[in-house]
Amino acid sequence: MEGSRPRAPSGHLAPSPPAFDGELDLQRYSNGPAVSAGSLGMGAVSWSESRAGERRFPCPVCGKRFRFNSILALHLRAHPGAQAFQCPHCGHRAAQRALLRSHLRTHQPERPRSPAARLLLELEERALLREARLGRARSSGGMQATPATEGLARPQAPSSSAFRCPYCKGKFRTSAERERHLHILHRPWKCGLCSFGSSQEEELLHHSLTAHGAPERPLAATSAAPPPQPQPQPPPQPEPRSVPQPEPEPEPEREATPTPAPAAPEEPPAPPEFRCQVCGQSFTQSWFLKGHMRKHKASFDHACPVCGRCFKEPWFLKNHMKVHASKLGPLRAPGPASGPARAPQPPDLGLLAYEPLGPALLLAPAPTPAERREPPSLLGYLSLRAGEGRPNGEGAEPGPGRSFGGFRPLSSALPARARRHRAEEPEEEEEVVEAEEETWARGRSLGSLASLHPRPGEGPGHSASAAGAQARSTATQEENGLLVGGTRPEGGRGATGKDCPFCGKSFRSAHHLKVHLRVHTGERPYKCPHCDYAGTQSGSLKYHLQRHHREQRSGAGPGPPPEPPPPSQRGSAPQSGAKPSPQPATWVEGASSPRPPSSGAGPGSRRKPASPGRTLRNGRGGEAEPLDLSLRAGPGGEAGPGGALHRCLFCPFATGAPELMALHLQVHHSRRARGRRPPQADASPPYARVPSGETPPSPSQEGEEGSGLSRPGEAGLGGQER
């Protein structure tokens, strides 16, 4: 097909394959004289002219033309010795574009490196390279001009008259369009006094300072430059200058753009810092400070008098004050009302102001009357009240261990009689307060101990008197504001009734405060029935019994049982004709069966004995009486001197440890164990429970004693479940 086309006699098929420039002439001359040479020559000239107009980018090495500059750049890489990238400033040539960029940075070291500046630099490089190539192409085309190639200048003539962008070589129909393009893309910052334009705001500022010498007006021009309103005025000015010669325009622009490059370090000074009035942090911009102030939106009403830091909540300030107390030690923190230098002050007043509820509060010496007249700064904030009876604490000297600076923390902890007496007779206040406090604390501890633990040999009359003393002690506590669980008449931190009046510690509940008060009063209500041990908590006594009296807990103790509590503290009076029943015994965990019921229950009753220890009251504010964990002898007195021996109700097994008995019942006499054994194994008569040192009872005695117990399986496993 390719060889048949040039042989065709028709003239319109000859110029159809004009894709090969060199081969076309050879095929044309080999066709013979049949083809009209004139027509072919005219067609060849017209085709070559059209092809030359399309391929406007010739190679400077081999002369080959290309349609696009990018293809020419790729083609130049094929020439080993050619370096297509040339520096427009010094003529340096580079084989790659990246190398030329690195070289151009040496000419403009202080040019800003923003993304827009990089883009403009790249566009300038491309424009300069295009101009260099076009210049070389024109020079080579002029030297090798022939009649066939003279027509190459015809399609290039209109390009010279078009309006080109000096940066990106874009074509525009009118000069206004080109100026608009330059202003939007390449020169957005324009001077309001001349036709200078730049792509960077720093360059415009430098131009305004150097050319016009008015720093105020360029700042106004820069602030007004970004809005599009003042922009349409300058474009008509450069119109008559850019129309005649658009090509040499990059030369002055090239000179103008690098000149403001060293203006970066000569920028106007930064605006003054914007400082936060709350925390003191400074910012360079106002909107940074505005965003920072969002953190301080909430009210900071509680300020530290030492460092000035503010807090939202009062307890934050209190925790913060501990830091200053640990750092400053005995030094006093400067308060807001501190004035000129005064007489030497007590060194530990500042520490007490920071820690008003700590133990050091009770050890602070009393300050001078001049210091008490000062208005309180932190003391009022920390709920410390002035001395009662005199304004600003101007009364007589208080006790050395109970006040500081005329202020008394937790003043409701003192007896009401002492406070009244202090207000009436201020001259004897110190001795009276000390005596009242000692008497009050001693009487409170002794009265509570006497009411809890009556001495043996005391009759019901003494019990009634003890109950009356306990009631009077409770009334005194209510008067002094020390009743556990009650509220105090005065406000402040002590109004919850959970602060210790001795050391000032705060507790979460009234029970914790009650247990803590036993440390100061020496009260130990939980006494061991087997030895002289006494504990402040029931858990301490339980641990003591488990560790030292485990064998004695299984049976009756060797000594006589302790005296029962007075009848006034019992929930119900004992029945007539019966001796006073002992305190209820709490069964040991894991025991095989509970003790037989009291004599009041019928012989055939299966009702479990009640535990009155959980319901009885001791008359101290409606609180439950502590459990008695000791074991008492049964009604028959079957316990021997050596403790009880636990015998199995189903087999002859016996042991002195209740834990082993419970394990034996679970392994050998549970439902699962009975299911594995033959039925005659369970038909054996049960063995009664016999103390150690005695023989098993007869079957008749078993029937009599077993009538008062529940069924064997229930008795054995019921105690284990408990």
From Swiss-Prot:
<feature type="region of interest" description="Disordered">
    <location>
        <begin position="542"/>
        <end position="648"/>
    </location>
</feature>
<feature type="region of interest" description="Disordered">
    <location>
        <begin position="215"/>
        <end position="275"/>
    </location>
</feature>
<dbReference type="InterPro" id="IPR013087">
    <property type="entry name" value="Znf_C2H2_type"/>
</dbReference>
<feature type="compositionally biased region" description="Pro residues">
    <location>
        <begin position="259"/>
        <end position="272"/>
    </location>
</feature>
<feature type="zinc finger region" description="C2H2-type 8">
    <location>
        <begin position="526"/>
        <end position="548"/>
    </location>
</feature>
<dbReference type="Pfam" id="PF00096">
    <property type="entry name" value="zf-C2H2"/>
</dbReference>
<dbReference type="GO" id="GO:0045944">
    <property type="term" value="P:positive regulation of transcription by RNA polymerase II"/>
</dbReference>
<dbReference type="GO" id="GO:0008270">
    <property type="term" value="F:zinc ion binding"/>
</dbReference>
<dbReference type="GO" id="GO:0060174">
    <property type="term" value="P:limb bud formation"/>
</dbReference>
<dbReference type="GO" id="GO:0032332">
    <property type="term" value="P:positive regulation of chondrocyte differentiation"/>
</dbReference>
<dbReference type="InterPro" id="IPR036236">
    <property type="entry name" value="Znf_C2H2_sf"/>
</dbReference>
<feature type="zinc finger region" description="C2H2-type 2">
    <location>
        <begin position="85"/>
        <end position="107"/>
    </location>
</feature>
<dbReference type="GO" id="GO:0016020">
    <property type="term" value="C:membrane"/>
</dbReference>
<feature type="zinc finger region" description="C2H2-type 9">
    <location>
        <begin position="646"/>
        <end position="668"/>
    </location>
</feature>
<feature type="modified residue" description="Phosphoserine">
    <location>
        <position position="692"/>
    </location>
</feature>
<feature type="modified residue" description="Phosphoserine">
    <location>
        <position position="698"/>
    </location>
</feature>
<keyword id="KW-0010">Activator</keyword>
<keyword id="KW-0238">DNA-binding</keyword>
<keyword id="KW-0804">Transcription</keyword>
<feature type="region of interest" description="Disordered">
    <location>
        <begin position="384"/>
        <end position="495"/>
    </location>
</feature>
<dbReference type="GO" id="GO:0005654">
    <property type="term" value="C:nucleoplasm"/>
</dbReference>
<feature type="zinc finger region" description="C2H2-type 1">
    <location>
        <begin position="57"/>
        <end position="79"/>
    </location>
</feature>
<protein>
    <recommendedName>
        <fullName>Zinc finger protein 219</fullName>
    </recommendedName>
</protein>
<feature type="compositionally biased region" description="Pro residues">
    <location>
        <begin position="558"/>
        <end position="568"/>
    </location>
</feature>
<feature type="compositionally biased region" description="Low complexity">
    <location>
        <begin position="463"/>
        <end position="477"/>
    </location>
</feature>
<dbReference type="GO" id="GO:0005634">
    <property type="term" value="C:nucleus"/>
</dbReference>
<feature type="modified residue" description="Phosphothreonine">
    <location>
        <position position="695"/>
    </location>
</feature>
<feature type="zinc finger region" description="C2H2-type 7">
    <location>
        <begin position="498"/>
        <end position="520"/>
    </location>
</feature>
<keyword id="KW-0479">Metal-binding</keyword>
<feature type="zinc finger region" description="C2H2-type 4">
    <location>
        <begin position="189"/>
        <end position="212"/>
    </location>
</feature>
<dbReference type="GO" id="GO:0001227">
    <property type="term" value="F:DNA-binding transcription repressor activity, RNA polymerase II-specific"/>
</dbReference>
<feature type="compositionally biased region" description="Pro residues">
    <location>
        <begin position="225"/>
        <end position="247"/>
    </location>
</feature>
<keyword id="KW-0805">Transcription regulation</keyword>
<feature type="region of interest" description="Disordered">
    <location>
        <begin position="668"/>
        <end position="722"/>
    </location>
</feature>
<keyword id="KW-0539">Nucleus</keyword>
<dbReference type="InterPro" id="IPR003980">
    <property type="entry name" value="Histamine_H3_rcpt"/>
</dbReference>
<feature type="region of interest" description="Disordered">
    <location>
        <begin position="1"/>
        <end position="21"/>
    </location>
</feature>
<feature type="modified residue" description="Phosphoserine">
    <location>
        <position position="16"/>
    </location>
</feature>
<feature type="region of interest" description="Disordered">
    <location>
        <begin position="137"/>
        <end position="160"/>
    </location>
</feature>
<keyword id="KW-0597">Phosphoprotein</keyword>
<dbReference type="GO" id="GO:0006355">
    <property type="term" value="P:regulation of DNA-templated transcription"/>
</dbReference>
<feature type="zinc finger region" description="C2H2-type 6">
    <location>
        <begin position="302"/>
        <end position="324"/>
    </location>
</feature>
